A protein has these predicted regions:
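Alpha-helical transmembrane segments of polytopic membrane proteins
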Residues: 15-23, 53, 80-92, 146-158, ...
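Hydrophobic transmembrane alpha-helical segments in integral membrane proteins
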Residues: 2-26
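Amphipathic alpha-helical packing elements
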Residues: 43-69, 197-203
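Alpha-helical membrane segments in multi-pass integral membrane proteins
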Residues: 118-124, 143-199
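Membrane-interface interhelical loops and short amphipathic "cap" helices
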Residues: 2-11, 42-43, 66-79, 136-144
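Juxtamembrane "helix-exit" motif on the non-cytosolic side of transmembrane helices
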Residues: 33-38, 66-69, 101-106, 129-140, ...
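Membrane-interfacial loop-to-transmembrane alpha-helix junctions, especially the N-terminal start
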Residues: 39-51, 76-79, 110-118, 175-182, ...
Length: 203
């Protein structure tokens, strides 16, 4: 596609602006967490959590922003595909970090061994599946079967984390029961997004 003749479309521009604001917000939030940490492990973990999400998403959102203004090219298409792979892995790490945040927030609770195994096993399996070349991340075809498998395992990881926050409930006055709904919504939206990324061509 000739960049000189490409005319950006308004929906693409609006999406690009939203993506840029989202990444900037995450970046600032992560920096604030680290600045306020003062050696407190919980704040450090929240900073790592935020920057993990921001950093992973940046790998596929930045190419999308470029595509919105310059059109699609083989290089941008490849970067978007690779970015989706990276963000799939970092989103899995996001849930594992939430496990450690739960442990620090509620030291009086012990994670059931079965739930912890469930979280770790599903996270490792998902990352392993994400690394398979058969995913065809950088092609329009993708791999619907592996996409379903990835997101199915991802749902298991999310359910494991939700169980932990349901167990702790409102202990300590943190009102962490709301985390259950937040994680559920995040899991559903993430799953829908990545299924869409397989169904809708990258270019």
């Amino acid at each position: 596609m000739d960049h000189k003749t490409y005319q950006p479309k308004m929906p693409d521009i609006m999406e690009a602006i939203f993506d840029a604001i989202y990444l900037l917000f995450d970046l600032v939030a992560g920096i604030v967490f680290f600045a306020m940490a003062q050696g407190r492990p919980l704040f450090v973990l929240y900073g790592i959590l935020t920057l993990t999400l921001c950093g992973g998403d940046a790998f596929h959102l930045v190419p999308r922003i470029f595509r919105a203004f310059r059109g699609s090219t083989p290089k941008i298409k490849h970067l978007m595909g690779t970015g989706l792979q990276i963000s799939s892995i970092t989103m899995t790490a996001f849930y594992v970090i939430l496990l450690f945040i739960w442990k620090l927030t509620f030291p009086g609770f012990a994670a059931p061994a079965a739930v912890e195994v469930m979280i770790w096993a599903s996270a490792i399996i998902r990352i392993a599946v994400c690394l398979l070349p058969q995913n065809n991340w950088c092609t329009d075809e993708g791999n619907l079967k592996l996409s379903i498998l990835r997101n199915g395992v991802f749902a298991v990881t999310g359910i494991g984390v939700m169980i932990l926050y349901a167990i702790s409930g409102n202990a300590g006055g943190y009102h962490m029961t709301k985390m259950v709904a937040a994680i559920l919504i995040f899991s559903i939206m993430s799953g829908l997004y990545f299924v869409r990324s397989i169904v809708v061509p990258l270019g």
